[in-house]
Design a protein with these regions (language model features):
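Extracytoplasmic/secreted envelope proteins and their assembly/folding machinery
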Residues: 64-67, 71, 94-97, 137-144, ...
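Active-site histidine-acidic residue metal-binding/catalytic motifs
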Residues: 6, 10, 14-96
Length: 222
């Protein structure tokens, strides 16, 4: 995708926010990894095994499907939001963070959420923040609780040693963004039962709905 077209897509998303009355927060949505262009996945790795039925999940496709749903639901609820990566190419972490920080410089309402599918042979969902106690921790707890409520069938992976359920990691998008930032790992794409949920359109709707319910609660804290 040409640079001019990317700028138009970003501006279109920004203009969409301007038309609506301002919400208390503006959600910057990061759909991690690349999408699929002409049948070719744009990111090395970041995919499930090929399952016995022949299907294979590409994480970047899943992430975009969830982020697109979340954005539409937020639009319907009048909550400002911006998809940081409208293109299908695999945009670098540095560029993603730069786009987010530029938005925050001009609009201090911004909060950041990166959506992913997990890997490593486990099961369940988890929410990450940067190390230490920050405002992100409160947001992560809200995301965690909504996912736990929506998905009782999924293992709620948590670390309560510091008093809250989020896990901490030095992920680039968490430590280099200026605003409160969380990263959601929805379920494991390399575990068959979890991956079936990641494929499911019904469960994709549930993942998105839980995120939006959490954002509505975060909005009320501003």
């Amino acid at each position: 995708m040409k640079k001019g077209m990317i700028t138009k897509l970003l501006n279109k998303s920004k203009n969409k926010c301007k038309i609506m009355a301002k919400s208390k927060c503006k959600v910057l949505l990061d759909n991690g990894h690349g999408g699929i262009i002409n049948g070719i996945y744009q990111t090395a790795g970041k995919r499930s095994p090929v399952w016995p039925d022949g299907r294979q999940l590409f994480e970047g496709e899943f992430n975009r499907a969830i982020v697109n749903r979340v954005s539409k639901l937020l639009d319907n609820k009048g909550i400002d939001n911006l998809i940081l990566v409208p293109e299908l190419t695999d945009v670098s972490l540095g560029t993603r963070v730069s786009r987010a920080n530029k938005e925050y410089i001009h609009d201090k309402r911004c909060i950041f959420l990166s959506v992913h599918a997990n890997a490593g042979g486990g099961t369940g969902f988890e929410v990450f923040t940067s190390p230490g106690e920050t405002k992100s921790d409160k947001h992560a707890t809200i995301y965690f609780n909504e996912y736990k409520k929506e998905f009782p069938e999924l293992r709620a992976r948590q670390d309560i040693t510091d008093g809250d359920p989020d896990k901490e990691a030095n992920y680039y998008v968490l430590v280099h963004t200026y605003m409160p930032a969380c990263l959601m790992e929805c379920a494991f794409m390399d575990t068959l039962q979890n991956c079936k949920m990641l494929f499911s359109e019904t469960d994709r709707d549930r993942f998105a709905s839980a995120i939006v319910t959490a954002i509505e609660k975060i909005e009320k804290t501003y």
